């Protein structure tokens, strides 16, 4: 500890140095020490604020432009794990690669086993992030939801797709309802060729299925399996590419016109620009949920998902729509309203 400022050295030498000189040096050291204390405290507070105000402290991407790059944040370490929606797994994986490049002491890994499984897993604490096409309120109990924090990272359009040999290129919501309830079974009933419709559905628990059925059936209960129930969006891609006379549904990022055709709904093309104002009715917000007590690595990765590094470019590159581009919002009940 430095000597007390009030102390006056006698006018003698100490170790060959005049007492007056020692006092002057003490004052200079004291001032330098105070400056170091101040700067250290300021940097510490800035670091705490930077970590505390983002990550699992709020929801939505509206503050993304103000967050900057998580890659520039203070170095973090740890393991981030996720499960959930396969629809935007590619986006999460692409973002994870960039994040790990900038933060080599963090590993980010996971699976796309469906929104329901992802939400159940994050609520149980078996993963640190649950990815979902639907609000947690639609899949979990209220006491589970209250312990989670939602981060809305993108919006995705979803639409019906048909085999290459199918001549139908536009269906109404009423026609889709008939097909996916088993009431319409032949393509000629909707203006196509005389051929039996092969319905490829997603398994129960899929957020893509929940979003599609909510748009087509509203509040009506549906329990129609179709000819097959598939686990993931990638499985639908594969099956649609090898099956004639089939119909299914996929998010826009999984459209592949070399394997199947995406068709209009009510005369509206499945385009991102038509989703932003709700002209195209089948769409969902992509959610990433974490625990309120999430670790720093998870918080930092979610901050990165909302940063300009992801929202400014990567979201659209991966076939999604930035939340900031939307002119409307959709709540947990499915109600759409203007921003």
Please provide the spans of the model-predicted regions.
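N-terminal secretory signal peptides
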Residues: 1-33, 41-53
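Serine/proline-rich low-complexity intrinsically disordered segments, especially terminal tails, linkers
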Residues: 14, 22, 36, 61-64, ...
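Exported/periplasmic ABC-transporter solute-binding proteins
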Residues: 29-31, 57-124, 128-142, 148-339
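N-terminal hydrophobic signal/anchor transmembrane helix of membrane proteins
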Residues: 38-39, 168
């Amino acid at each position: 500890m430095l000597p007390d400022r009030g102390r006056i050295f006698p006018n003698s030498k100490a170790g060959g140095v005049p007492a007056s000189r020692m006092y002057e040096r003490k004052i200079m050291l004291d001032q330098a020490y105070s400056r170091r204390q101040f700067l250290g405290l300021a940097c510490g507070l800035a670091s705490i604020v930077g970590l505390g105000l983002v990550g699992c402290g709020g929801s939505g991407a509206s503050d993304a432009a103000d967050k900057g790059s998580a890659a520039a944040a203070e170095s973090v370490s740890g393991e981030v794990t996720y499960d959930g929606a396969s629809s935007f797994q590619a986006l999460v994986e692409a973002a994870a690669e960039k994040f790990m490049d900038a933060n080599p002491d963090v590993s980010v890994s996971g699976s796309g086993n469906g929104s329901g499984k992802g939400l159940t897993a994050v609520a149980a604490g078996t993963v640190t992030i649950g990815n979902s096409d639907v609000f947690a309120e639609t899949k979990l109990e209220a006491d589970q939801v209250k312990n989670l924090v939602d981060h809305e990272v993108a919006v995705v359009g979803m639409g019906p797709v048909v085999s290459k040999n199918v001549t139908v290129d536009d269906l109404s919501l009423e026609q889709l309802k008939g097909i996916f309830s088993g009431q319409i079974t032949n393509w000629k009933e909707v203006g196509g060729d005389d051929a039996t419709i092969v319905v490829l559905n997603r398994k129960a628990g899929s957020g893509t299925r929940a979003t599609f059925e909510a748009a087509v059936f509203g509040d009506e209960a549906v329990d129609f399996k179709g000819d097959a129930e598939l686990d993931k969006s990638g499985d639908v891609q594969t099956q649609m590419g090898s099956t004639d006379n089939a119909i299914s549904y996929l998010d826009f990022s999984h459209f592949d016109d070399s394997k199947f055709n995406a068709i209009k709904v009510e005369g509206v093309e499945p385009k991102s620009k038509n989703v932003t104002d709700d002209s195209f009715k089948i769409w969902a917000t992509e959610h990433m949920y974490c625990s309120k007590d999430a670790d720093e690595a998870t918080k930092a990765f979610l901050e990165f998902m909302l940063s300009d590094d992801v929202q400014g470019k990567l979201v659209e590159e991966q076939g999604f729509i930035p939340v900031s581009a939307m002119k409307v919002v959709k709540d947990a009940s499915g109600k759409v309203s203007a921003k």
